[in-house]
Amino acid sequence: MGYLLTIACYIASFSPSIALFCSFIAHDPVRIILFFLGSFFWLVSLLFSSLAWLGLSTVLPDTFLLSLTVCIIAQELSRVAYFMLLKKAQRGLNKITRQGQISVAPGVSDLHNARHMLALVCGLGMGVISALFYTMNAFAIFSGPGTIGLPNALKTGEIDTNRAGKYLPLCYTLSAILLTLFHVTWTIMVWDSCHKIGRIPSAFVPGAAAVVSHLLVTFLSSLNSRGFHVLVFAVQFLILLICIAYCNVIMGGTISSFVNGIGQSITDAVTLKQVRTLIEERKLRTQRQSVPDEPMTERAGTSNTVNA
């Protein structure tokens, strides 16, 4: 039962990431490389955060909040460093594909001026590796005899990590989904600031919004151990909607188009549009493959007449 629970948690946690990967990344080799490179940059930021935490723990008695802040700043700086690297490598990427011409490398799309798509790809790479590191220790415990909680931590710690009870796997799964999508929005906002810096006075606003929302979401997550799971997820989901709407505006959309898109998605989900579309396509495919009986009868009658 423990292994089945772990597999179900992994599938649910990374299903949105898999959907985005298959829709926007899987068909392009360059985007696949950038996806994994984004994961690498997040791992580098985690390394520097670990070194900072190790150094601070030898000086200060309680370094939780300070180490958490340093970790967030390191992650945002890694996004800036990734943007600068891609900006310098843009000439090399443009040599692979020329705009309006046949690609030198088949299957590689034109990445020129595809800033927001690059941000989505790289942010998804950061989000996936972040969610994996966030969940894999807990999911490894779930794969055991089915005991939910951290027994060793319960013996030495003061916080009741077992307060969520049977809903603890669900909490980790929802947190992983939100964390992945948050990293996509934060990357879009930070890269928009990096692109517009020095061009407009308000270029710092998207980057500041990313840092503030990152801090807020992270500190809200620390309240999960105190039993405020429903409240934390509700606030985080609201913040995610605001971040997605802001990214939609950054990419040239409007709030009304964002609201209409959500309404249409809900309508399609309720009416099972995808299922109905698949059924209709299968019916059409079956009708095209089937051979009608009347022409065969007519041919048979014609042949009998000729023989007579």
Swiss-Prot record:
Keywords: Membrane, Notch signaling pathway, Transmembrane, Transmembrane helix
Gene Ontology molecular functions: protein-macromolecule adaptor activity
A GO cellular-component term linked to this record: endoplasmic reticulum
Subcellular localization: Membrane
Membrane topology note: Multi-pass membrane protein
Record-linked InterPro entries: Aph-1 (IPR009294)
Gene Ontology terms: biological process: cell fate commitment; cell fate commitment involved in pattern specification; embryo development ending in birth or egg hatching; embryonic morphogenesis; nematode pharynx development; Notch receptor processing; Notch signaling pathway; oocyte development
Region annotation (Disordered) ranges: 286-308
Keyword Chaperone among record annotations: no
UniProt superkingdom: Eukaryota
Spans through the membrane: 5-25, 32-52, 53-73, 122-142, 170-190, 200-220, 230-250
Principal location class: membrane
Role, per record: Essential subunit of the gamma-secretase complex, an endoprotease complex that catalyzes the intramembrane cleavage of integral proteins such as Notch receptors (lin-12 or glp-1). It may represent a stabilizing cofactor for the presenilin homodimer that promotes the formation of a stable complex. Required for the localization of aph-2.
Family the entry assigns: Belongs to the APH-1 family.
Subunit structure comment from the entry: Component of the gamma-secretase complex, a complex probably composed of the presenilin homodimer (sel-12, hop-1 or spe-4), nicastrin (aph-2), aph-1 and pen-2.
Listed name of the protein: Gamma-secretase subunit aph-1
Origin species: Caenorhabditis elegans
Origin organism lineage: Eukaryota, Metazoa, Ecdysozoa, Nematoda, Chromadorea
Gene that specifies this protein: aph-1
